[in-house]
Every structure is written in structure tokens, then in C-alpha cells.
Swiss-Prot record:
<feature type="domain" description="ABC transporter">
    <location>
        <begin position="39"/>
        <end position="278"/>
    </location>
</feature>
<dbReference type="InterPro" id="IPR003439">
    <property type="entry name" value="ABC_transporter-like_ATP-bd"/>
</dbReference>
<keyword id="KW-1278">Translocase</keyword>
<dbReference type="GO" id="GO:0016887">
    <property type="term" value="F:ATP hydrolysis activity"/>
</dbReference>
<dbReference type="InterPro" id="IPR017871">
    <property type="entry name" value="ABC_transporter-like_CS"/>
</dbReference>
<protein>
    <recommendedName>
        <fullName>Methionine import ATP-binding protein MetN 2</fullName>
        <ecNumber>7.4.2.11</ecNumber>
    </recommendedName>
</protein>
<dbReference type="InterPro" id="IPR027417">
    <property type="entry name" value="P-loop_NTPase"/>
</dbReference>
<comment type="similarity">
    <text>Belongs to the ABC transporter superfamily. Methionine importer (TC 3.A.1.24) family.</text>
</comment>
<dbReference type="GO" id="GO:0005524">
    <property type="term" value="F:ATP binding"/>
</dbReference>
<dbReference type="Pfam" id="PF09383">
    <property type="entry name" value="NIL"/>
</dbReference>
<dbReference type="InterPro" id="IPR003593">
    <property type="entry name" value="AAA+_ATPase"/>
</dbReference>
<keyword id="KW-0067">ATP-binding</keyword>
<comment type="function">
    <text>Part of the ABC transporter complex MetNIQ involved in methionine import. Responsible for energy coupling to the transport system.</text>
</comment>
<keyword id="KW-0997">Cell inner membrane</keyword>
<keyword id="KW-0472">Membrane</keyword>
<comment type="subunit">
    <text>The complex is composed of two ATP-binding proteins (MetN), two transmembrane proteins (MetI) and a solute-binding protein (MetQ).</text>
</comment>
<dbReference type="InterPro" id="IPR018449">
    <property type="entry name" value="NIL_domain"/>
</dbReference>
Length: 394
């Protein structure tokens, strides 16, 4: 219910009030942005009053979103993601710090200023919140109708948007006949009616099945490319970040704990919260393989014919594809691939290879965990990968 009120309130607040005329235009010119990032947060804090006292939802958040990029904000439930997004569209005011959208200080705006801002800031909500008694066309046209836009212009604009989101054939359908993905496409079209410069997405795919999620993310990416639109989306799913975002910020207990290009954050996560979120994408060894891997002996030599199991990881820092042949040649002897794979994120190849390698006979010392051939093998692996560690032997 709260999201429904937010949706309707946002639609009404983003409409130019009928009869405002030249005053509204003049005020919009007064808040026209000049240069800089599309979205900027400077040491932003947000405190709410609770029966138990003050509760900090956000603490000292500093972020910059470049114009034209897709910026993802991810965190667990209650981390502060939705509060942050509500600050960007003026549904909440910061308790401290400064929020700028298109160069405009959101916290300093009066109601007229917020109207002008929201015309340039579209909003896609988690729940579709469509009016059941209105058709697809009427739902998308509603903000324009409230704004007093002439009918002919409304028709032109809405039909173009329905074509953009792939719903031209559903123009006269009612929400009850639509799938979840189609309903969200209506929500996206509605968010674009005022030609916004920034699109805010609040868990826009969390109510959808995986296949539909991918289609909506593909639509957002297409809109970003076609319109040059800056998109800020919040999610709790790393798959969403990987699929569509250029940059990601990880938020934990109201603080931004890590930020960077998606390929870097995925390939080399530096904070525990990031690693925890990524754990759902990083599969453990298959049970059958894990049962075969034995821990290295502390003192005794390895059994004859044993191979060292290495976990080799590529973070994408080199930019090119890993030279697996060079790795195998450096390790020497018999090298077997046991598990893993390589994928490309933003043109950076990264992934994990679990391999079994035979220590070379010319490496000095016994093949134990304390040095000798195992240490030499590990050192050679590290020369050809970003990270490598010994898991045991088979």
C-alpha cells in the first residue's frame, strides 16, 4: 500500500500543475543543472525517529553517478538502499550532507522545485501499481493527462513509448490480462513519459521470474543505449548487477563499503559484505570432487602419483583472456582440469580454475605443505594468475 501511495504521489508531484504557465517554466529554468555528475551524494546521512530514539538509516554516504551510466546499489534487506533512492527523488530529505541530481540540490528545493526535478527523474517501482480500471494506454498517459498535456500530444507520446517497451499490441488491454513482465513494461513506459534524464529503479525485477527478469534488464539496457539515460537501480541480486550495470556500490548497515566497476568488484571483492553477496554466484566444489581432495600432510611426503590441487583465479585485471596454455606449461608435467570456468564481464575475462598438477622432479625439497615442490608449484601458478592457493591433493 505504501508503494501505491508513493507511485500515485510521484505521478502527481511530477506533473506540471495546470495553469502554472510561465511561472512553472521560469522556475524550471532556475533549477537547470550545470555540468558535473548526473547524481552526487556528499557525506549524506539520514536519521529516523523511532520509539527507541534516533535510528541512522544512512551514514556518511558519498557517491558519484556519471551521466549515461547504469549504476547499481546493492545490499541486504534493511541495508538502506530504498532510503537512499527516496532521497534522490525527494520523497525523503537528508538529515545531513547534500544530494544533487542533475546538479540540483534536492534537499534545498521547495515544492515547485520538486515538481521540476521529478519531471526529469523517472521512477520504476518494485510493485507495478497500475490502475486496474484503466487500459495500458491510459495508465501510461495518466501523468501527461494530470499535467494538462493536449490529447494529440499524449497519444503521440504514449504510442511511441509503448512501441519502445514492446507493448504496442497491448494498447487497449487491462492490467488483469497482463503478465508480470508486461506490467513492469507498462511501469517503465509510464516512468519515461516526461522524457527524464535520470531513471530510478527500486527492485524493479524482484517480483519477476528469472526469464522475465532477463527480458526487463535487456529492456533497461536498450533504453540506456538508445536514450543515453542515466539509470540508478537498487537490488539485492548480484545477477542483476552483473547483467546490466557499469558501476556498483555495496551498502551495508547504512554505509557504502565498496564501490567500483562491476568487473573489478566481481573479480576482486574487497569487503566481507561484498563477498557474502557474491557467494551465491561462486559455487563450491562439487561434492564428489570435494570428497576426493585430501589435506596436505604437515611433515610426510605426498604419496606416489599424487597431484596438487590448485584453485586458480582470474580477476580480469589484465583485460585479456587468461592464457591457460602458458599456465599449464609453467606448471609442467601432467595438468588436469577438475572444475571451474571463465566468463567475461565488461570485456574483462575472469573466473576460477581448479586444476590438479604434478610437482616437477627438479623442484628441491620434499613435496609437503611446508615448502619444496608444493611451494614451487604454487609460485609458478601465481605468475600466470591473479590469485592461486593450494586446496590439497588427489
Amino acid at each position: 500500500m505504501t508503494q501505491l501511495f508513493d507511485t500515485l504521489g510521484f505521478i502527481e508531484a511530477s506533473a506540471v500543475r495546470a495553469g502554472a504557465g510561465a511561472d512553472a517554466v521560469a522556475h524550471e529554468e532556475a533549477v537547470t543543472p550545470v555540468g558535473g555528475a548526473a547524481v552526487s551524494l556528499e557525506q549524506v546521512g539520514k536519521v529516523f525517529a523511532t520509539p527507541r530514539g534516533q535510528a541512522a538509516a544512512l551514514r556518511d554516504v558519498t557517491l558519484d553517478v556519471r551521466r549515461g551510466e547504469v549504476f547499481g546499489i546493492i545490499g541486504r534487506s534493511g541495508a538502506g538502499k530504498s532510503t537512499l533512492l527516496r532521497l534522490l527523488n525527494g520523497l525523503e530529505r537528508p538529515s545531513s550532507g547534500r544530494v544533487r541530481v542533475q546538479g540540483v540540490d534536492v534537499g534545498a528545493l521547495d515544492e515547485d522545485g520538486l515538481v521540476a526535478l521529478r519531471r526529469r527523474t523517472g521512477m520504476v517501482f518494485q510493485h507495478f501499481n497500475l490502475l486496474s480500471a484503466k487500459t495500458v494506454f491510459e495508465n501510461v498517459a495518466l501523468p501527461l493527462k494530470i499535467a494538462g498535456v493536449p490529447k494529440a500530444e499524449r497519444v503521440r507520446k504514449v504510442e511511441a513509448l509503448l512501441e519502445l517497451v514492446g507493448l504496442a499490441a497491448k494498447r487497449d488491454a487491462y492490467p488483469a490480462s497482463l503478465s508480470g513482465g508486461q506490467k513492469q513494461r507498462v511501469g517503465i513506459a509510464r516512468a519515461l513519459v516526461h522524457d527524464p534524464e535520470v531513471l530510478l529503479c527500486d527492485e524493479a525485477t524482484s517480483a519477476l521470474d528469472p526469464e522475465t527478469t532477463q527480458s526487463i534488464l535487456a529492456l533497461l539496457a536498450d533504453i540506456n543505449r538508445r536514450l543515453g539515460l542515466t539509470i540508478v537501480l537498487i537490488t539485492h541480486e548480484m545477477e542483476v548487477i552483473r547483467a546490466v550495470c557499469d558501476t556498483v556500490a555495496v551498502i551495508e548497515q547504512g554505509e557504502v563499503v565498496e564501490t567500483g566497476p562491476v568487473w573489478r568488484v566481481f573479480g576482486d571483492p574487497r569487503h566481507g559484505a561484498t563477498r557474502a553477496l557474491l557467494s551465491t554466484l561462486q559455487h563450491d566444489l562439487p561434492a564428489e570432487l570435494a570428497a576426493r581432495v585430501r589435506p596436505l600432510p604437515e611433515q610426510a611426503a605426498l604419496p606416489d602419483g599424487a597431484q596438487i590441487v590448485l584453485d586458480v583465479r582470474y580477476t580480469g585485471e589484465s583485460g585479456g583472456e587468461p592464457d591457460v596454455g602458458a599456465l599449464a606449461a609453467a606448471l609442467g608435467g601432467s595438468v588436469r582440469f577438475l572444475h571451474g570456468g571463465i566468463e567475461s564481464i565488461q570485456g574483462h575475462a575472469q573466473g576460477r580454475l581448479v586444476i590438479a598438477a604434478t610437482p616437477r622432479a627438479d623442484d628441491a625439497g620434499p613435496s609437503t605443505a611446508r615448502g619444496g615442490a608444493v611451494a614451487a608449484l604454487l609460485e609458478r601458478a601465481r605468475r600466470h594468475a591473479n590469485h592461486a592457493e593450494v586446496l590439497g591433493y588427489v
